[in-house]
Amino acid sequence: ESFFNSVMSVVENYPPCALHVLMNHIGTHDTARAITRLAGENPDGYGRDWQHEHNILSESDYKKGISMMKTASLIQYTLPGVPSLYYGDEAGVQGMKDPFNRTCFPWKDINAELHKWYKRLGEIRNGCKAFRRGVFVPVYSLYNTIAYKRVSEENEVLVAVNNSAETVDVPVGSEWDNSYNLFDAVSKDGYIRLAPYEYTLLSKYFQANGGSNFCPLHSQPRCLTKI
């Protein structure tokens, strides 16, 4: 609920011309690297010596951070506004606060999994008008699980994220049954079953007569090719 309260406080207080160009970021040059902040220790209140000692994540924490970065960036790229990416976050760069967050771009050590993920997020957002100009509609929020829609005159897209350690059945309505899914989880009987830390994105397109068209894979635009 607090997530939607925060988002709606922005949506309801900015005109569309400003809302759709707001900078959405999860990391900047003034903060610890996003992957470090998500999976590592909180550097607030610690000096540079401590931050230097804790600057590199363990292998298990780094793997966890990659997963958490995917979840965070999926939300970042599908909320109203423009996703703003701090250089290197898409490559898996880690580091505590300044100066540890300002290392050179790792041209020879890019995290291929995360880099590919960000490329697809960019393609999806650029190819789907609902993410660029669509109305934001909250759908569900409970126990670290959220679902929301972005709706334009051309299409409607639903984003559902389970950021908990429990399997959750998210009520979204039977109108999403048989919709096109970019991830494994689908709507069945009006519910999306999400495994722990799973997410999904469903899409449907509107017909000229006001109905909905659930496009098969071969007729989907490039932005809706499965990741």
Show the residue positions of the predicted features.
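Active-site and adjacent substrate-binding regions of carbohydrate-active enzymes
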Residues: 1-217, 221-223, 227
